[in-house]
UniProtKB/Swiss-Prot annotation:
A 1,2-diacyl-sn-glycero-3-phospho-(1'-sn-glycerol) binds at residue 139. One of its GO terms (cellular component) is plasma membrane. The gene is lgt. This is Phosphatidylglycerol--prolipoprotein diacylglyceryl transferase. HAMAP family: Lgt.
Length: 270
Protein backbone atom coordinates (compact mmCIF):
# COMPACT_ATOMS: atom_id res chain seq x y z
CA UNK A 1 0.00 0.00 0.00
CA UNK A 2 1.23 3.49 -0.85
CA UNK A 3 0.93 6.39 1.61
CA UNK A 4 -1.41 9.18 0.57
CA UNK A 5 0.54 12.47 0.47
CA UNK A 6 -1.03 14.81 3.00
CA UNK A 7 -1.37 17.91 0.82
CA UNK A 8 -3.48 20.78 2.10
CA UNK A 9 -6.19 21.45 -0.54
CA UNK A 10 -5.67 25.16 0.20
CA UNK A 11 -2.52 26.31 -1.59
CA UNK A 12 -2.50 29.86 -0.21
CA UNK A 13 -4.52 31.49 2.56
CA UNK A 14 -4.46 35.25 3.14
CA UNK A 15 -6.89 36.05 5.90
CA UNK A 16 -10.34 34.88 4.78
CA UNK A 17 -9.13 34.51 1.18
CA UNK A 18 -8.25 30.95 0.23
CA UNK A 19 -6.75 29.80 -3.06
CA UNK A 20 -7.27 26.09 -3.61
CA UNK A 21 -5.01 23.79 -5.57
CA UNK A 22 -8.04 22.65 -7.57
CA UNK A 23 -8.59 26.18 -8.84
CA UNK A 24 -4.91 26.53 -9.64
CA UNK A 25 -5.12 23.33 -11.69
CA UNK A 26 -7.69 25.04 -13.90
CA UNK A 27 -5.19 27.84 -14.49
CA UNK A 28 -2.49 25.27 -15.28
CA UNK A 29 -4.80 23.59 -17.79
CA UNK A 30 -5.80 26.85 -19.47
CA UNK A 31 -2.22 28.15 -19.55
CA UNK A 32 -0.85 24.87 -20.86
CA UNK A 33 -3.51 24.76 -23.56
CA UNK A 34 -2.63 28.29 -24.66
CA UNK A 35 1.09 27.49 -24.85
CA UNK A 36 0.55 24.36 -26.94
CA UNK A 37 -1.99 26.13 -29.15
CA UNK A 38 0.44 28.99 -29.78
CA UNK A 39 3.03 26.48 -31.01
CA UNK A 40 0.51 24.89 -33.37
CA UNK A 41 -1.12 28.15 -34.48
CA UNK A 42 0.90 28.76 -37.65
CA UNK A 43 0.09 25.29 -38.94
CA UNK A 44 -3.61 25.83 -38.18
CA UNK A 45 -3.95 29.32 -39.68
CA UNK A 46 -0.96 31.63 -40.31
CA UNK A 47 -3.27 34.66 -40.40
CA UNK A 48 -4.41 34.20 -36.81
CA UNK A 49 -2.79 36.46 -34.22
CA UNK A 50 -1.94 35.54 -30.63
CA UNK A 51 -4.73 37.92 -29.58
CA UNK A 52 -7.30 35.93 -31.54
CA UNK A 53 -5.92 32.72 -30.04
CA UNK A 54 -6.25 34.21 -26.56
CA UNK A 55 -9.88 35.09 -27.33
CA UNK A 56 -10.51 31.50 -28.41
CA UNK A 57 -8.93 30.04 -25.27
CA UNK A 58 -10.93 32.46 -23.10
CA UNK A 59 -14.26 31.41 -24.60
CA UNK A 60 -13.33 27.75 -24.46
CA UNK A 61 -12.47 28.18 -20.76
CA UNK A 62 -15.86 29.79 -20.20
CA UNK A 63 -17.45 26.83 -21.94
CA UNK A 64 -15.60 24.42 -19.66
CA UNK A 65 -16.58 26.25 -16.47
CA UNK A 66 -20.22 27.02 -17.29
CA UNK A 67 -20.84 23.74 -19.10
CA UNK A 68 -19.04 21.71 -16.45
CA UNK A 69 -21.13 23.22 -13.68
CA UNK A 70 -24.46 22.92 -15.50
CA UNK A 71 -23.54 19.40 -16.58
CA UNK A 72 -23.01 18.36 -12.98
CA UNK A 73 -26.34 19.92 -12.02
CA UNK A 74 -28.25 18.15 -14.81
CA UNK A 75 -26.51 14.77 -14.82
CA UNK A 76 -25.51 14.17 -11.22
CA UNK A 77 -27.65 16.03 -8.66
CA UNK A 78 -30.61 17.67 -10.36
CA UNK A 79 -33.10 17.20 -7.51
CA UNK A 80 -30.89 19.04 -5.00
CA UNK A 81 -30.51 22.02 -7.33
CA UNK A 82 -34.21 22.11 -8.13
CA UNK A 83 -34.90 22.26 -4.39
CA UNK A 84 -32.37 25.08 -3.96
CA UNK A 85 -31.36 26.70 -7.29
CA UNK A 86 -28.92 29.07 -5.58
CA UNK A 87 -26.64 26.08 -4.97
CA UNK A 88 -25.69 26.31 -8.64
CA UNK A 89 -23.60 29.38 -7.85
CA UNK A 90 -21.74 27.79 -4.92
CA UNK A 91 -18.94 26.53 -7.14
CA UNK A 92 -16.43 26.57 -4.29
CA UNK A 93 -18.22 23.53 -2.85
CA UNK A 94 -17.31 21.48 -5.93
CA UNK A 95 -19.42 19.81 -8.55
CA UNK A 96 -18.08 19.86 -12.12
CA UNK A 97 -18.76 17.32 -14.87
CA UNK A 98 -16.45 16.68 -17.82
CA UNK A 99 -19.27 15.79 -20.20
CA UNK A 100 -21.02 19.09 -19.46
CA UNK A 101 -17.75 20.94 -19.94
CA UNK A 102 -17.27 19.15 -23.26
CA UNK A 103 -20.68 20.33 -24.45
CA UNK A 104 -19.74 23.84 -23.31
CA UNK A 105 -16.52 23.67 -25.34
CA UNK A 106 -18.41 22.51 -28.42
CA UNK A 107 -20.87 25.41 -28.13
CA UNK A 108 -18.02 27.88 -27.64
CA UNK A 109 -16.12 26.44 -30.63
CA UNK A 110 -19.20 26.63 -32.85
CA UNK A 111 -19.90 30.24 -31.84
CA UNK A 112 -16.28 31.37 -32.17
CA UNK A 113 -15.79 29.58 -35.47
CA UNK A 114 -18.91 31.15 -36.92
CA UNK A 115 -17.59 34.60 -36.06
CA UNK A 116 -14.10 33.90 -37.40
CA UNK A 117 -14.61 31.98 -40.62
CA UNK A 118 -13.89 28.48 -39.31
CA UNK A 119 -16.14 25.46 -39.40
CA UNK A 120 -17.06 23.69 -36.19
CA UNK A 121 -14.85 20.68 -36.89
CA UNK A 122 -11.91 22.77 -38.09
CA UNK A 123 -11.82 24.37 -34.65
CA UNK A 124 -12.55 21.16 -32.75
CA UNK A 125 -9.71 19.38 -34.57
CA UNK A 126 -7.39 22.20 -33.49
CA UNK A 127 -8.67 22.22 -29.91
CA UNK A 128 -8.85 18.46 -29.25
CA UNK A 129 -5.08 17.89 -28.70
CA UNK A 130 -5.09 20.71 -26.13
CA UNK A 131 -7.80 19.23 -23.92
CA UNK A 132 -5.77 16.46 -22.20
CA UNK A 133 -3.64 19.13 -20.51
CA UNK A 134 -6.70 20.42 -18.68
CA UNK A 135 -7.99 16.91 -18.02
CA UNK A 136 -4.70 15.83 -16.47
CA UNK A 137 -4.42 18.96 -14.35
CA UNK A 138 -8.00 18.54 -13.16
CA UNK A 139 -7.38 14.95 -12.04
CA UNK A 140 -4.36 16.08 -10.04
CA UNK A 141 -6.69 18.60 -8.40
CA UNK A 142 -9.13 15.80 -7.59
CA UNK A 143 -6.30 13.79 -6.05
CA UNK A 144 -5.15 16.70 -3.87
CA UNK A 145 -8.75 17.19 -2.75
CA UNK A 146 -8.92 13.46 -1.90
CA UNK A 147 -12.13 13.14 -3.91
CA UNK A 148 -13.46 10.80 -6.60
CA UNK A 149 -11.48 7.87 -5.24
CA UNK A 150 -11.93 4.26 -6.25
CA UNK A 151 -13.29 1.03 -4.83
CA UNK A 152 -11.61 -0.91 -2.00
CA UNK A 153 -8.74 -3.06 -3.23
CA UNK A 154 -5.64 -4.93 -2.10
CA UNK A 155 -3.40 -3.94 -5.03
CA UNK A 156 0.11 -2.85 -3.91
CA UNK A 157 -0.52 0.77 -4.96
CA UNK A 158 -3.79 1.15 -3.03
CA UNK A 159 -4.17 4.24 -0.85
CA UNK A 160 -6.09 5.17 2.28
CA UNK A 161 -7.55 8.63 1.81
CA UNK A 162 -7.97 11.10 4.71
CA UNK A 163 -10.83 10.56 7.19
CA UNK A 164 -12.61 13.76 6.13
CA UNK A 165 -12.93 12.24 2.66
CA UNK A 166 -13.29 8.53 3.45
CA UNK A 167 -14.52 7.88 7.01
CA UNK A 168 -14.35 4.12 6.36
CA UNK A 169 -10.55 4.40 5.98
CA UNK A 170 -10.29 1.61 3.43
CA UNK A 171 -7.42 0.98 1.03
CA UNK A 172 -8.74 2.09 -2.35
CA UNK A 173 -7.84 2.42 -6.00
CA UNK A 174 -6.36 5.91 -6.60
CA UNK A 175 -8.71 6.29 -9.56
CA UNK A 176 -7.84 9.97 -9.93
CA UNK A 177 -4.30 8.93 -10.84
CA UNK A 178 -5.60 6.32 -13.28
CA UNK A 179 -7.58 9.06 -14.99
CA UNK A 180 -4.57 11.37 -14.96
CA UNK A 181 -2.50 8.68 -16.67
CA UNK A 182 -5.15 7.80 -19.26
CA UNK A 183 -7.12 11.01 -19.90
CA UNK A 184 -4.13 13.27 -19.34
CA UNK A 185 -0.90 11.56 -20.39
CA UNK A 186 -2.00 8.77 -22.76
CA UNK A 187 -4.65 10.84 -24.52
CA UNK A 188 -2.21 13.73 -24.92
CA UNK A 189 0.35 11.45 -26.56
CA UNK A 190 -2.19 9.76 -28.85
CA UNK A 191 -3.77 12.98 -30.10
CA UNK A 192 -0.60 14.99 -30.54
CA UNK A 193 1.21 12.20 -32.37
CA UNK A 194 -1.84 11.64 -34.58
CA UNK A 195 -2.28 15.35 -35.31
CA UNK A 196 1.36 15.83 -36.35
CA UNK A 197 0.45 14.76 -39.88
CA UNK A 198 -2.37 16.29 -41.95
CA UNK A 199 -5.63 14.49 -41.23
CA UNK A 200 -9.05 14.82 -42.84
CA UNK A 201 -11.42 17.18 -41.08
CA UNK A 202 -13.24 15.48 -38.16
CA UNK A 203 -10.63 12.75 -37.73
CA UNK A 204 -8.80 14.33 -34.78
CA UNK A 205 -12.11 15.16 -33.11
CA UNK A 206 -13.19 11.57 -33.63
CA UNK A 207 -9.99 10.25 -32.08
CA UNK A 208 -10.54 12.43 -29.03
CA UNK A 209 -14.13 11.30 -28.55
CA UNK A 210 -13.23 7.64 -29.09
CA UNK A 211 -10.28 7.39 -26.75
CA UNK A 212 -11.64 9.64 -24.02
CA UNK A 213 -14.84 7.61 -24.03
CA UNK A 214 -12.93 4.33 -23.81
CA UNK A 215 -10.60 5.52 -21.04
CA UNK A 216 -13.42 6.98 -18.95
CA UNK A 217 -15.65 3.93 -19.46
CA UNK A 218 -12.88 1.60 -18.26
CA UNK A 219 -11.87 3.62 -15.18
CA UNK A 220 -15.51 3.79 -14.06
CA UNK A 221 -15.28 0.08 -13.23
CA UNK A 222 -12.95 0.86 -10.30
CA UNK A 223 -14.19 4.36 -9.39
CA UNK A 224 -16.87 4.77 -6.74
CA UNK A 225 -19.93 6.49 -8.27
CA UNK A 226 -21.39 9.67 -6.81
CA UNK A 227 -23.23 8.79 -3.61
CA UNK A 228 -26.49 10.48 -4.64
CA UNK A 229 -26.64 8.40 -7.84
CA UNK A 230 -24.95 5.08 -7.16
CA UNK A 231 -25.13 2.47 -9.90
CA UNK A 232 -27.85 3.04 -12.48
CA UNK A 233 -28.23 -0.51 -13.88
CA UNK A 234 -27.16 -4.10 -13.22
CA UNK A 235 -25.15 -3.12 -10.17
CA UNK A 236 -22.22 -1.72 -12.16
CA UNK A 237 -23.34 0.83 -14.78
CA UNK A 238 -22.49 4.42 -13.79
CA UNK A 239 -23.56 7.80 -15.11
CA UNK A 240 -20.01 8.32 -16.38
CA UNK A 241 -20.29 5.18 -18.51
CA UNK A 242 -23.70 6.14 -19.85
CA UNK A 243 -22.36 9.54 -20.89
CA UNK A 244 -19.14 8.09 -22.34
CA UNK A 245 -20.73 5.41 -24.51
CA UNK A 246 -22.20 7.95 -27.00
CA UNK A 247 -18.72 9.52 -27.25
CA UNK A 248 -17.23 6.17 -28.28
CA UNK A 249 -19.92 5.65 -30.91
CA UNK A 250 -19.65 9.24 -32.17
CA UNK A 251 -15.86 8.98 -32.31
CA UNK A 252 -15.96 5.84 -34.44
CA UNK A 253 -18.52 7.44 -36.74
CA UNK A 254 -16.53 10.67 -37.15
CA UNK A 255 -13.33 8.78 -38.00
CA UNK A 256 -15.17 6.62 -40.52
CA UNK A 257 -16.91 9.65 -42.07
CA UNK A 258 -13.69 11.69 -42.20
CA UNK A 259 -11.82 9.06 -44.20
CA UNK A 260 -14.85 8.22 -46.32
CA UNK A 261 -14.99 11.86 -47.43
CA UNK A 262 -11.25 11.91 -48.10
CA UNK A 263 -10.21 8.62 -49.76
CA UNK A 264 -6.70 9.96 -50.41
CA UNK A 265 -6.14 10.41 -46.68
CA UNK A 266 -7.43 6.91 -46.08
CA UNK A 267 -4.88 5.45 -48.51
CA UNK A 268 -2.07 7.51 -46.99
CA UNK A 269 -2.92 6.18 -43.52
CA UNK A 270 -2.58 2.54 -44.59
Amino acid sequence: MLPYPQIDPVAVAIGPLQIHWYGLMYLVGIGGAWLLASRRLNKFDPTWTKEKLSDLIFWLAMGVIVGGRLGYVLFYDLSAYIANPLLIFEVWKGGMAFHGGFVGVMIAAWWFGKRNGKSFFQLMDFVAPLVPIGLGAGRIGNFINAELWGKPTDVPWAMVFPPFSDPAQLARHPSQLYQFALEGVALFIILNLYARKPRPTMAVSGMFALFYGIFRFVVEFVRVPDAQLGYLAWGWVTMGQILSLPMIIAGLFLIWLAYKRDPAASKAAV
